[in-house]
């Protein structure tokens, strides 16, 4: 559909939000309606509707910092408040599944990856697989989520694995590990413990593919794991404008941006690539203007941070949007480079379409 406020300029909008990215960025009165949409859809799926803000018990498990009342469950579904404490629903375990992904994978940082390029690590030829670790919970609620099956796992509360059990999956053919989901952001302690067990036996790269919404208490430990193992921290910057981010994901990006700044500072002394920014080009929402804001933010942190522009594929509640067009991707690349970024690429080129729409 076309945004009702921009029919003359034909700006795309998804029915689930009813307005385009420009309207959501500029009109705060639309955000309450967007959050109501998130709450209704999540409640229908058996999930906690919104990030709790009225309770007295603060959860520091991730960057949402839910403020929970007695017995209330956090947004991620993994923790609840009891008395004055936060209690893990699955002590010592996480809702997680895994599979082996033959290399080369569809990794968003493949062009700077030590395993793929074999410049920094001498990976034995027999190591041919990436261990893809899929966490079945998330601290975000992207309306276009590409891995929405994590919600079913959250509700089911299974499969469950301890860090030791997950680490034991690694074998001699494993070249690297990537935590994604869902998101490792609300499973930080489990991922760190798993990584420690892995490195007792295997010296392989550990990577994170994340929305970046970590609790600060875990951030430097995760950075250390990634840096020391020669992995990458793939950070999905969904939007810079706070209202737009809230409308698309149901959560704030305040901690996300703060975490990215902090990681960029850590990465300035890097000997190999460490932090990678990814931007999903969602038609009608993440166009030239918003991409410019995101890239300006990245450039202010460090112009050398590798940045990948990703094509959008219609999914979840945004099935009515087209795939990202080639024109959209190429115009956004021009914007990224104009903002000073020196290592920009367009990813998943095979998804790009010939659709014509307003890419502003």
PLM ranges: what are they?
Residues 1-48, 53-54, 59-64, 70, ...:
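Auxiliary Fe-S-binding modules of radical SAM enzymes
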Residues 16, 33-36, 72-75, 79, ...:
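A generic "cationic amphipathic patch" detector
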Residues 159-321:
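Conserved AdoMet/S-adenosylmethionine-binding subsite of the radical SAM
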């Amino acid at each position: 559909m076309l945004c009702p406020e921009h029919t003359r300029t034909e700006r795309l909008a998804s029915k689930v939000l009813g307005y385009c990215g420009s309207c959501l960025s500029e009109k705060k009165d639309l955000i309450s309606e967007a959050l109501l949409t998130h709450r209704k859809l999540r409640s229908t799926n058996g999930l906690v509707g919104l990030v709790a803000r009225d309770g007295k018990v603060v959860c520091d498990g991730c960057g949402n910092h839910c403020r929970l009342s007695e017995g209330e469950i956090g947004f991620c579904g993994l923790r609840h408040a009891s008395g004055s404490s936060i209690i893990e629903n699955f002590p010592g375990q996480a809702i997680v599944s895994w599979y082996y992904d033959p290399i080369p994978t569809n990794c968003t940082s493949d062009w700077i990856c030590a395993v793929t390029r074999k410049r920094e690590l001498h990976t034995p030829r027999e190591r041919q697989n990436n261990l893809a670790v899929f966490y079945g919970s998330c601290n975000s609620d992207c309306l276009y989520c590409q891995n929405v099956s994590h919600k079913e796992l959250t509700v089911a509360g299974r499969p469950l694995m301890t860090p030791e059990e997950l680490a034991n999956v690694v074998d001699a053919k494993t070249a690297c590990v990537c935590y994604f989901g869902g998101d490792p952001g609300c499973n930080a302690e489990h991922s760190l413990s798993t990584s420690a067990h892995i490195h007792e036996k295997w010296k392989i790269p550990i990577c994170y593919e994340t929305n970046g919404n970590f609790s600060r208490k875990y951030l430097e430990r995760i950075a250390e794991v990634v840096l020391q193992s020669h992995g990458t921290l793939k950070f999905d910057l969904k939007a810079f404008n706070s209202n737009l981010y809230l409308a698309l994901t149901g959560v704030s990006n305040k901690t996300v941006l703060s975490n990215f700044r902090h990681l960029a500072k850590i990465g300035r002394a890097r000997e190999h690539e460490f932090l990678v920014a990814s931007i999903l080009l969602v038609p009608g929402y993440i166009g030239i203007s918003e991409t410019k804001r995101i890239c300006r933010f990245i450039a202010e942190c460090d112009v050398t941070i590798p940045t990948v522009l990703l094509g959008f594929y219609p999914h979840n509640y945004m099935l009515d949007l087209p795939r990202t067009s080639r024109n959209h991707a190429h115009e956004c690349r021009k914007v990224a480079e104009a903002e000073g970024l020196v290592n920009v690429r367009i990813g998943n080129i095979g998804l790009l379409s010939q659709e014509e729409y307003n890419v502003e």
